[in-house]
Amino acid sequence: QPGLLPSRQLEQKSPEGPPPHELVVRIVERTPIGSIQSSAGYTLVDAAGVALSTTPEPPPGHPVIDAAGGVGSDAFDAVGTVFRSLPADIRAQVTDMTATTANDVTLTLGGTGTEVVWGNADDSAYKAVVLAKAMTARPPDGVSSYDVSSPNAVVMR
């Protein structure tokens, strides 16, 4: 692939050269899901765990991830699946994502400190819809936690 420089910021790049004089380049940028704290600072990562950048402070607009086993673990994969399933307006409120196993993902909504108990990543799209409806019915400023781990029986405290 001459002419295309390697970059960790790109997930895919594929040049296509349909004849006779056209060149099409398709590029897919990596999308960060959050940052992981280490002795070097906060490393912004995508869902595959690819490091995109490191800064001394948490990057604004990206939650801090604490997944047991780090990138490549089942806990990290579950956090990534959950985060990507959230609608943009809820995603923007998430400041922390934790998981000690793939079955206990928990989110924190920064403006209020409200905890979202997610459980495992199964049915994440459905859980995201249930969470959005619960947040509309009872906004986070009046709730200490939402439990959508059993999405057919959401619990708000």
Residues covered by each model-derived region:
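Charged, solvent-exposed interaction patches on well-folded alpha/beta domains
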Residues: 2-157
